[in-house]
Curated annotation (Swiss-Prot):
NCBIfam families: recomb_XerC. It is found in: Cytoplasm. Its main location: cytoplasm. This is Tyrosine recombinase XerC. Belongs to the 'phage' integrase family. XerC subfamily. One of its GO terms (biological process) is DNA transposition. Keywords: Cell cycle, Cell division, Chromosome partition, Cytoplasm, DNA integration, DNA recombination, DNA-binding. GO terms for molecular function: DNA binding; tyrosine-based site-specific recombinase activity. One of its GO terms (cellular component) is cytoplasm. Forms a cyclic heterotetrameric complex composed of two molecules of XerC and two molecules of XerD.
């Protein structure tokens, strides 16, 4: 047990008996708790022991383990051992307050979904066909990637949402916050092709994307169509709306150093947890978009 004092060693032995007899924990759990206590004791400052450790010391220990790459599960186990130790010392009258009470382990950030590279997206968007379903689906996928829309945002678009002459789409995002997002030339062309078919579908709904019977497309239907085209184009990844949105963000950030512009294009309050949300004028957003997005450039005459 390293450089522990005799009192610490005695307390740990009593703690082990307490876990077995009174808490009736399994031998495996008891072993894990003792292992964790021995580990964290080596991370405490030299003048701090398991008997006089404070809340700030436990916070520092957890932060160190987090930085070392300990998994959330391992951090949770360590925290449980620390809390049980505090409860034991409290029960024995050796401390007045459990310093670990209320502590929570640092959470590791969830990995972002893998984006599709430009070549894969280009291949996906090269679908051909003149039937209404193909034209509609191509327009949806182009718009997802062109403007980084959320699934709910695209599904809620109406015929009046797109300003074709200005190459803009008016989007109602989370919290009913409206924003204007540029639309690339490829997406505009695909939308115009779909619009010809859309106008021939009897429909009382003003939705931009509808079924053959004139009903607004559901979220599930849009997801299903994206997955279908990913399979038909023989892509190695499953295609879904958020993957296109994430690819939009990734490719924009790779081409542009303007994090705040991309943040606003996405409609995020925070793209980075440390980045304070700032509002940019639309002219600047359009300029960044036009110079950075792979499919925003005007098509050259062939």
């Amino acid at each position: 047990m390293g450089d522990m004092s005799d009192l610490e060693v005695t307390c740990l032995q009593d703690y082990e008996r307490y876990l077995h007899s009174e808490r009736q924990l399994s031998a495996h759990t008891v072993h894990n708790y003792l292992y964790e206590l021995n580990r964290v004791s080596t991370l405490l400052p030299k003048d701090v022991t398991l008997l006089n450790v404070g809340r700030e010391h436990w916070q520092q220990v957890l932060a160190k383990l987090h930085r070392k790459g300990l998994s959330p599960r391992s951090l949770s186990l360590c925290l449980s051992a620390i809390k049980q130790w505090g409860e034991f010392l409290l029960r024995e009258g050796m401390i007045a307050v459990n310093p670990a009470k209320g502590l929570s382990a640092p959470k590791q950030a969830k990995p972002l979904p893998k984006n599709m590279d430009v070549d894969s997206l280009t291949h996906l968007l090269e679908i051909e066909g003149t039937d209404p379903l193909t034209l509609r689906d191509k327009a949806m996928m182009e718009l997802f990637y062109s403007s980084g829309l959320r699934l709910a945002e695209l599904a809620a678009l109406n015929l009046s949402s797109v300003q074709y002459d200005l190459r803009e789409v008016r989007v109602l995002g989370k919290g009913n916050k409206e924003r204007i997002v540029p639309v690339g030339s490829y997406a505009i062309k695909a939308l115009e092709a779909w619009l010809v078919c859309r106008q021939q579908i009897p429909c009382e709904d003003c939705a931009l994307f509808v079924t053959g019977k004139g009903r607004r497309l559901s979220h599930r239907s849009i997801q299903s169509r994206m997955a279908k085209w990913g399979q038909e184009q023989a892509l190695s990844v499953r295609v879904h709306p958020h993957k296109l949105r994430h690819s939009f963000a990734t490719h924009m950030l790779e081409s542009s150093a303007d994090l705040r512009a991309v943040q606003e294009l996405l409609g995020h309050a925070n793209l980075s947890t440390t980045q304070i949300y700032t509002s940019l004028d639309f002219q600047h957003l359009a300029k960044v978009y036009d110079s950075a997005h792979p499919r925003a450039k005007k098509q050259q005459d062939k």
